[in-house]
Amino acid sequence: MPDIMTTYTFLSAKPSIMNNKAPTSKRDQLFAELLTEPSQFSFNESVVDVFPDMIQRSVPGYPTVVRMSGVLSEQYAKPNTCVYDLGCSLGESIRAAEIALNDRDCELVGIDNSAAMINRASETLGSTSKINWVLGDVTAMDYAQSSVVIMNFTLQFIPIERRLALLTKIRNAMIPGGLLILSEKLTMPDPEMDALMINLHHDFKRSQGYSDMEIAQKRDAIDNVLIPETAATHLDRLASAGFSRTRIWVQCLNFASFIAVA
């Protein structure tokens, strides 16, 4: 496995990746007014309109995860294989991979089950990109031979009982030495530490301009939609799916990114 410090050095030497900016969007004010009829969170047109702002202000460390998805893809992607981004949303991670790979002979595929996300990603990048956009359920897909699979904050939205089967399917489609990048919100096994991380995350969101009402209403909307797990649970499941080596490469509060080698 390449040394992680090497990848940080490599990142500094790649200004094209560092300058891969998020798509512009409106400011996220979806929960700024009191909602008399709260609804379950979904990735609809309203969310898509503000998504780049929402995720930047809600997920600590998100820009680093996106940029390093490109760096790691450059180190692991092999010609004549696929590079997948599962739950690609607006395609920031797969676009970072495309820039990093610099016309390497790989098929780049972004998959999401939100038509609003896929349509916006396709419209935004248009003819400037060779990424193939697919609308579909990542748990129901058949995957071609792949060398890199990116899942940034996707598995947490999939029912827990379907997560192992999906990871096993991904592993079985990978070439030996292929890489999975798996980023997730975490829960902590120690209740006091879990409460601390949640409170610190809320403080982070306040520092980004969210009000207490916005934080509370977003939390209520996303409960039972986003189901976090412990880091140990993720590592055990990756081993059960057949990955040979796994580790957390970055963590910020209760958000972490894992790498797993096939």
Q: Which role does the model predict for each range below?
A:
Residues 8-11, 15-40:
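N-terminal auxiliary segments of SAM/dcSAM-dependent transferases
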Residues 36-41, 45-66:
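Class I SAM-dependent methyltransferase Rossmann-like catalytic core
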Residues 60-79:
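Conserved alpha-helix/loop element of class I SAM-dependent methyltransferases that forms part
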Residues 84-85, 89-140:
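Class I SAM-dependent methyltransferase SAM/SAH-binding core
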Residues 150:
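A conserved beta-strand element that flanks and buttresses the S-adenosyl-L-methionine
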Residues 164-176:
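A short glycine-rich, Lys/Arg-flanked "PGG" loop and its adjoining helix->strand segment in the class I
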Residues 181-207:
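Conserved class I S-adenosyl-L-methionine
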Residues 224-241:
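Short alpha-helix
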